[in-house]
């Protein structure tokens, strides 16, 4: 929670669930410009689930964690529309600084017991560490590769080999840069059986690695695909050998494996892989750009006793924000 005297009078509460949101502000942090209208939908959805999660667990005796493995600076630079009839000012596009996932999570009430952020860039790490000046919460910041840092966190006390391990519960937000989340990391999180994972699966980035012909996939792309899917079965599923045809001179030509899988089939394979390690895989919240599926936001959990409750919160979020995603993605 923000320290006394630092709470903005402009904060508002979502009319449905009471999610606090930080509006447009100015900041001295390094610029972190990314995303578009779909980014706010993603952050709104995550924020709403965090509120639901904290309400559900607030009297259960657990220590709750918000874990953001690609936390950025805590805020983002964006262009927003200002003015209009109700403001009696001309409509114009202005640059603003909006709360990112870290600041939104820090504004959830009741607060999490611990906030854990990781980043690789020193300037972003410094910006995250500066959040301690504005919030009373226990904020832990780690610099390094997100996959490595998550392995350290969940293989160490209090998550492992500690008398209070049973008390630990977390929401883990994976909003990676490209295809940087390894399947081994998802497996590690599933094995805890105590975390809810929100994973922004980079559907478009994966498809871009899949050349039309299997021969067009170089070693680096193949390694990236093996890493994100946790197997090499994808090639057999996505590519089919075409019948060999003779050349103009009658010489035989070796068959060529051609990609036959559609974007929907590739996404279905990803869900199948998630389902192999998590007991619960939500329907995705599609995040579209110009009407095309670029990302899919999933909730994953391997905590069977809590799945009915998790499912109730997730289904509300997906149902609420899917129409908004389609509206804002129009070209």
Where does each model-flagged region fall?
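Conserved beta-strand signature within the Rossmann-like core of class I S-adenosyl-L-methionine
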Residues: 193-205
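C-terminal target-recognition/interaction regions appended to catalytic cores
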Residues: 291-331
